[in-house]
């Protein structure tokens, strides 16, 4: 694009100068927007103030027709690039003022570099954005080599490009920029104007989520020009760079042009600003002209489509997806809103005054999720998002106990089964079975012999615990009820008849469990307190007194001693 095309409202690419010094970092320019201003502004040159870098703010002096006094020297191992006017070429004497670097690495507002441009050179507004790149990262890109410690100058190719920038991988503090405003249209009258405040661009590749911009000494020292009522309002928020891992790896490893050739003609976002054609993306190239990345602009079309004397253009840069180190390893990833919906990222803001350049700090809100840097391993990790717990559904049918235990469960389920009736029957069945002296195994064996294997001992056990589905319980209930009634009738006729009904040989029949009355338990505990290890004669006397079998009493004493051993209360007894 012709740098001097200032008559139309379009984006112009200013000539770029990158001064590298030593082993630290470099800084890069930003783009400018041409707009028609009233005629009297041609005679009123405005000085452009370039804010210092993010680490030291070393000044750069540009020799020209008009030159402002440079600020205090700051010995820095960085290089600063100033945005230049379209008609001004880079003089050969652009040099770096060595300046001391602060120990803390934070930008000193008083050390901001001050440059001046000749009057009548730049039309409209120009934004100066400064980015820093470690020299190690520059050395990894093909064609971008670090200069000698004494300083060097090189220009990246700008042929056919509408805007250019350089990747920033180290931004510890916000970088400040000042737009120079100069007159270019001599054909229009000049109405009364207001001061045009300088704005600052705030990069987001920092560990802090949002930092409010602070005014610097350079901003205060800038001369206040006469403002124009119809000056367009521009809010620029460069949030970073969007890179593809394949592009980065190809560029850092010296990739061929055929790998990157398809990327030169396809911008990331094709939406353009109606009043300023050509603003679609900023393309990043190396010294050989190979495309290594693109910085697309997201335009809020709601505010652009409203024609007004003070049109408000809000431009927001796409946030980066990956952050690489000098070796090409991913050291950070940026979680943000999806790229295909750029218009919905920010809501249009009502301008407070007709002519005002705002700095809108990005702050996280509930409605608009803002990006946040997540330090990761070489493999990019996704930022976890807060989600409501998802209930885990099970395909298994709930058991009767689960259904009955629910407080608001109706007594009838979807199949018309009375769950409360089944619960009461299971409880009564266990009591009646124990009263007959029968075990679950005996009942299971008897039912298996007559009804089949579905009525085994495990089925009886699950039924009594209600660990069974309602349908299975409904199937077991009538069979168990019928069998239990017949067993009680046999028991009334005699124990022998019951055993014959239950089945099984007497020799293999399990011995009936002995149950002690409360009085017998109290007497046995009294004897146990006197003598935990009674002799055989004493056991016989206790059994006769309580009217129990001698073997039953002996086993009770054994079990009682074992219980104390298990509870660690018996430690003085010695069994002979």
From Swiss-Prot:
Cell location: Nucleus
Identification of the protein by name: POU domain, class 6, transcription factor 1
Tissue and organ expression note: Isoform C1 and isoform C2 are found in the brain, while isoform C7 is found in the testis.
GO MF, one annotated term: sequence-specific DNA binding
Keyword Iron belongs to the record: no
Coiled coil residues, start to end: none
Disordered, as annotated region: 65-88
Record-annotated DNA-binding residue ranges: 509-568
Gene expressing this chain: Pou6f1
Pfam family, one: Pou
Organism whose genome encodes this protein: Mus musculus (Mouse)
SUPFAM superfamilies given in the database record: Homeodomain-like (SSF46689), lambda repressor-like DNA-binding domains (SSF47413)
Keywords: DNA-binding, Homeobox, Nucleus, Transcription, Transcription regulation
Gene Ontology cellular component annotations, sorted alphabetically: nucleus
Native organism taxonomy: Eukaryota, Metazoa, Chordata, Craniata, Vertebrata
Residue span(s) of domain POU-specific: 414-488
Chief location category: nucleus
Function: Transcription factor that binds preferentially to a variant of the octamer motif (5'-ATGATAAT-3').
């Amino acid at each position: 694009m012709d740098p001097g095309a200032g008559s139309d409202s379009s984006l112009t690419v200013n000539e770029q100068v990158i001064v590298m010094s030593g082993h630290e970092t470099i800084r890069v320019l930003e783009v400018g927007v041409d707009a028609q201003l009233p005629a009297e502004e041609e005679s009123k040159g405005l000085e452009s103030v370039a804010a210092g870098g993010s680490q030291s703010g070393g000044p750069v002096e540009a020799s020209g027709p008009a030159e402002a006094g440079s600020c205090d020297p700051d010995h820095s191992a960085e290089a600063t690039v100033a945005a230049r006017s379209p008609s001004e070429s880079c003089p050969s004497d652009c040099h770096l003022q060595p300046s001391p670097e602060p120990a803390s690495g934070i930008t000193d507002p008083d050390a901001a570099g001050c440059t001046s441009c000749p009057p009548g050179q730049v039309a409209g507004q120009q934004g100066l954005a400064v980015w820093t790149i470690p020299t190690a990262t520059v050395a990894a890109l093909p064609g971008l080599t670090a200069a000698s410690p004494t300083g060097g100058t090189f220009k990246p190719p700008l042929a056919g490009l509408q805007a250019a920038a350089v990747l920033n991988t180290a931004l510890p503090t916000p970088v400040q920029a000042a737009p120079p405003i100069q007159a270019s249209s001599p054909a229009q009258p000049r109405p009364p104007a207001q001061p045009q405040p300088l704005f600052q661009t705030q990069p987001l590749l920092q560990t802090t989520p949002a930092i409010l911009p602070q005014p610097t000494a350079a901003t205060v020292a800038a001369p206040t020009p006469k403002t124009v009522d119809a000056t367009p309002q521009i809010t620029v928020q460069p949030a970073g760079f969007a890179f593809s891992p394949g592009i980065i790896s190809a560029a850092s490893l010296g990739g061929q042009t055929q790998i990157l050739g398809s990327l030169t003609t396809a911008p990331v976002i094709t939406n353009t600003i109606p009043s300023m054609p050509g603003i679609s993306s900023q393309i990043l190239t190396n010294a050989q002209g190979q495309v290594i990345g693109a910085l697309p602009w997201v335009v809020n079309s709601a505010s652009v489509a409203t024609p007004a004397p003070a049109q408000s253009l809000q431009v927001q840069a796409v946030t980066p997806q990956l952050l690489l180190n000098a070796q090409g390893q991913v050291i950070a990833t940026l979680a943000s809103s999806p790229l295909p919906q750029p218009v919905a990222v920010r809501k249009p803001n009502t301008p407070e005054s007709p002519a005002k350049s705002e700095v809108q700090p990005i702050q996280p809100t509930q409605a608009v999720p803002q990006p946040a840097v997540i330090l990761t391993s070489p493999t990019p990790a996704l930022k976890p998002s807060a989600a409501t717990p998802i209930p885990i559904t099970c395909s298994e049918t709930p058991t009767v106990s689960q259904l009955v235990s629910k407080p608001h469960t109706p007594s009838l389920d979807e199949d018309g089964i009375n769950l409360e009736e089944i619960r009461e029957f299971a409880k009564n069945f266990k009591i009646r079975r124990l009263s007959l002296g029968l075990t679950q195994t005996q009942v299971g064996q008897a039912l298996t012999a007559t009804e089949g294997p579905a009525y085994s001992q495990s089925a009886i056990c699950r039924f009594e615990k209600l660990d069974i589905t309602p349908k299975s319980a409904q199937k077991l209930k009538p069979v168990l009820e019928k069998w239990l009634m017949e067993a009680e009738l046999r028991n009334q006729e005699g124990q022998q008849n019951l055993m014959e009904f239950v089945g099984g040989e007497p020799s293999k029949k399990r011995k009936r469990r002995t149950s002690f009355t409360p009085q017998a338990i109290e007497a046995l505990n009294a004897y146990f307190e006197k003598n935990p290890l009674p002799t055989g004669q004493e056991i016989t006397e206790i059994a006769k007194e309580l009217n129990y079998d001698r073997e039953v009493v002996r086993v009770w004493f054994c079990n009682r001693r074992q219980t104390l051993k298990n509870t660690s209360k018996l430690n003085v007894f010695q069994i002979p």
